[in-house]
């Protein structure tokens, strides 16, 4: 007889919790310790690089941003951008697994297309991500663009995973995220909520503040992503307010679950209506003709194959092999006094931010 999916989930959560407790004892984790680059038991390593997590998050519903680019009204465009942001949060059955820490110079690069639920196609989009440094802190950068529409989403993520006794805190709230719309000469600066892995409850959730603030228009959004209580409450619930910058007057309240249905309350007439429901994903990657040796799929192929075979011993061996090779490369650079130069990103001297090298992206 097949086991019920909830039973399987509970058993998986027990195994995860047991592995975490064992790890805490073995390496004597201290409160607030950053474990991002720390060695992890093979059973806790997710079979994908954090670059894959970033790439899928921002690309899979990019058609919503393309639709936003056709909206002339500032307020309506902001609402459409908020819809997109609620789709970037990953629903993952292995949400408690730790993504692989990328090596310096690891890349992901592909064109992609999206479809909406009406079957309309949105083509000519491109995503590029690269892990540009490990010292003084690990930093991954990505750019998701559609040149035809004049849209670019940039993401600079200085990774940390902090051990907080009963949970891990993943600091995506400290990432620098912004979306540019050339058509409107407008940039939207975004603060994302924090990602938490609840050790003894066996799941991950986003909690804390989300903010979307444009540089020009007079509207902004403040949202609070709420943690699931031990008893009652809802998973993935948030409440957001759309306000005017000049007066802080609240115009709308948006509330619901980011993975389900959301409602909007108009403060002018106190009428509540349907706002948004996370759409199905119609997302197709088109890989380059030449897959670089630095691509995540190449760098971690051995580990991914071992995971798919259920061989944790081989999985750890493959992880160790890549890490040791990387140390040799780093030591050689130090010996020869060579500074690593990213392949696809350059640092803007004026803003001190990493940006996609427009002349070297393909």
Swiss-Prot record:
One of its GO terms (molecular function) is sterol binding. Belongs to the OSBP family. Gene3D superfamilies: 2.40.160.120, 3.30.70.3490. Signal peptide: none annotated. It comes from the Eukaryota. The gene is osbE. InterPro entries: OSBP_sf (IPR037239), Oxysterol-bd (IPR000648). One of its GO terms (cellular component) is cytosol. This is Oxysterol-binding protein 5. Pfam families: Oxysterol_BP. It comes from Dictyostelium discoideum.
């Amino acid at each position: 007889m097949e086991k019920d999916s909830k039973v399987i989930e509970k058993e998986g959560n027990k195994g995860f919790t047991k592995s975490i407790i064992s790890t805490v004892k073995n390496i004597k984790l201290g409160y607030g310790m950053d474990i991002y680059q720390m060695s992890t038991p093979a059973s806790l390593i997710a079979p994908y690089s954090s670059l894959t997590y970033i790439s899928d998050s921002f690309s899979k519903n990019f058609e919503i941003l393309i639709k936003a680019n056709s909206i002339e009204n500032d307020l309506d465009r902001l609402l459409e951008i908020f819809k997109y942001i609620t789709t970037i949060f990953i629903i993952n059955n292995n949400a408690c697994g730790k993504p692989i820490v990328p090596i310096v110079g690891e890349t992901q690069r592909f064109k992609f297309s999206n479809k909406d639920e009406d079957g309309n196609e949105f083509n000519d989009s491109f995503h590029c991500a690269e892990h540009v440094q490990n010292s003084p802190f690990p930093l991954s950068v990505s750019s998701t663009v559609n040149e035809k529409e004049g849209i670019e989403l940039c993401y600079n993520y200085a990774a940390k995973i902090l051990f907080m006794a009963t949970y891990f805190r993943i600091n995506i709230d400290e990432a620098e995220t912004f979306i540019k719309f050339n058509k409107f000469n407008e940039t939207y600066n975004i603060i994302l909520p924090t990602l938490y892995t609840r050790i003894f409850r066996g799941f991950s959730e986003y909690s804390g503040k989300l903010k979307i603030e444009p540089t020009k228009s007079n509207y902004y959004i403040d949202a609070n992503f709420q943690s699931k209580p031990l008893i009652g409450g809802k998973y993935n619930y948030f409440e957001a307010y759309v306000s005017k910058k000049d007066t802080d007057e609240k115009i709308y309240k948006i509330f619901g679950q980011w993975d389900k249905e959301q409602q909007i309350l108009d403060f002018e007439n106190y009428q509540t209506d349907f706002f948004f429901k996370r759409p199905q994903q119609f997302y197709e990657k088109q890989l380059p003709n030449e897959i670089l040796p630095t691509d995540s799929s190449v760098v971690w192929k051995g580990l991914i194959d071992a995971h798919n075979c259920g061989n944790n011993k081989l999985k750890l061996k493959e992880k160790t092999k890549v890490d040791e090779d990387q140390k040799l490369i780093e030591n050689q650079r130090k010996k020869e006094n060579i500074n690593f130069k990213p392949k696809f990103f350059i640092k803007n001297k004026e803003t001190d931010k990493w940006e996609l090298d427009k002349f070297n992206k393909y």
